[in-house]
Amino acid sequence: MFDPFSSALRYGVAPLLVGFLLTAPVYAQTSSVTLPRLAIDQLTLPANWQRAGSVMALPTQSNLKTGQGNSLLVGNAGQALTLITNPTDFALQTDVLMTPGASAQLTLPTGQTVPLTDARLGKAPGLWQTVDIRYRAATASRPAILDRLVINGVTLREGQTLPRSATNGPITITVQNGSIALRNIGYRGLNNRSVAKWAGPLNYSIYEGETLVKSDLPGKKFLKKDTTSAISFESAYGIKPRNFTMLFSGRLNVTDEGTYQFDLDYGGRARLFVDGKEVITGDYKDLGAQMSVEISLTAGNHDVEVLFGRAWQRPGLGLFVSLPNTRPQALHTLVSLPEPDPVSVIGVLADAKPVLIRSFVLLPGEKLKRTHSLSVGTPAGRHFTIDLNQMALLQVWKGDFADVTEMWYERGEPQLLKPMGANVLLAPQTALMVLNDANAAWPDSVSETILQYKGLALDKQGMPTTEYALGGATVTDAIRPSADGLTRTMNLTGSANGPVICRVAAGTQIEEIAKGLYAVNDRSYYVRIDPALKPELRTANGRQELRLPVALKNGAATVQYEILY
């Protein structure tokens, strides 16, 4: 069984490095559990800290502009901010935004400090970053332990024994230089207390084929029905169809009235229902990346249902419940949520020259793998993945290059490449399109009759430039490292069979913060274009797009933009 707050290595033991520098540190991508929010309106703020409702920052601006409200904390260099006064074991996470050159640290109860950013993994100034810390207090038999320090989804420290301290101090944050903003501060005291138990046996039924729709079950072939004392994927032992659906139903008795957090972990597909209401909808994913929800419950019994569909991922199913000051308590059997096999991470570095790897890539929320993906690692530490079928720039990241364990370990059946650094997901569609209607929706995919990949060429440094045909025109696409990100240059030649549009960015939110500079997806990354250009910012179906018309003159045109992250 996997404990989401244990110090066990979720991604294997010591990494095996393949590439160019065998002694370089390699960091593992880490998933995080959502924590109860800290009431920042109840904190006592020193004079150099203030509450705010919004923050405005530029990558070159040394100070932060704030708006009225109480959802953020903004601090300048000076006195420490106390978050928790008498901590024991705890989990803490926060989003942090920094001005250029800013630095800040968190002081643990033992007096040791940990940084809130990392030179190799930190995002550009003015972008939101994530910090996740797990800590175990000292006991009579052992010193305190920093279970985990994760910055931007990458584990930097794990299972670190700390020097013994004569005192148990508060948790504080100190700004050393510049200014920072904090939001979504989550905190959980990890007390070992049982807060719920099954009121009786659970009923479960198994059906052939996978689905997440309960109303589909009566139409599927029934395979098995029985009871169990706790949720257990192993109840399906002996079922012959590889793909099937399990429905668990039971009554959960909770000890207190309060806000309970449920954490659902699974490999495959799953849904959680509490008192008849669907509270978690989880589609295809691997074990480890939990989905969480907070629910207000009265003391006593509540109906709980878990629908689980086995797909191609390694199967497993676990459900945890907790109050704001307790460790997550498992509502499943030990064998239902297996620990991953202790496999060393096989990492590829790109320290001496660019490295190109063809592989499959599976994006979060997608069922199908991207089977024609090219990932490029650069000595500058700026890496990216392109879907050659769609000529879509899928993801960009900083830090170490590629985790190829699922490609090269044993049979390598998944054939999946995963980023080893701080990853940023982009809109996974082509950036160029021929659209006869300027108001037409951007296509989710493009057929081979419109877009055809032609190949790639390497420059003297070993960086690729891809070539493809698009609606009668020929396009070369060159992505190169820049000081703070990647520059993408697309040259078009020939004659397109309609107006050509470049979609520079797409996401839930696009904000112009300076002339030619846009923050995307709640300051997840920036895009920069020539300030003289006049793009169109469109909103449709709750999403925004930044579109740029491309005019071919004398059979040629160039589009260039920069991604800063």
Summary of predicted features, one role per range:
Residues G186-Q261, D265-L349:
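Extracellular/secretory pathway-exposed regions associated with glycan biology
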Residues M1-R10:
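N-terminal secretory signal peptides that target proteins for export/translocation
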Residues T30-D41, I84, T333-T476, G485, ...:
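Beta-strand-rich N-terminal accessory domains
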Residues A104-P109, G316-N325, L492-E512:
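Acidic (Asp/Glu-rich), glycine- and aromatic
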Residues L156-A166, E234-S235, L272-E294, E512-P549:
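Solvent-exposed beta-strand/loop surfaces of large extracellular or lumenal domains
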Residues Q29-N253, Q329-L334:
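Carbohydrate-interacting regions of secretory-pathway proteins
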Residues L470-G471, S482, T487, S495-G507, ...:
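Beta-strand-rich recognition/accessory modules
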Residues G12-A24:
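Bacterial N-terminal signal peptides
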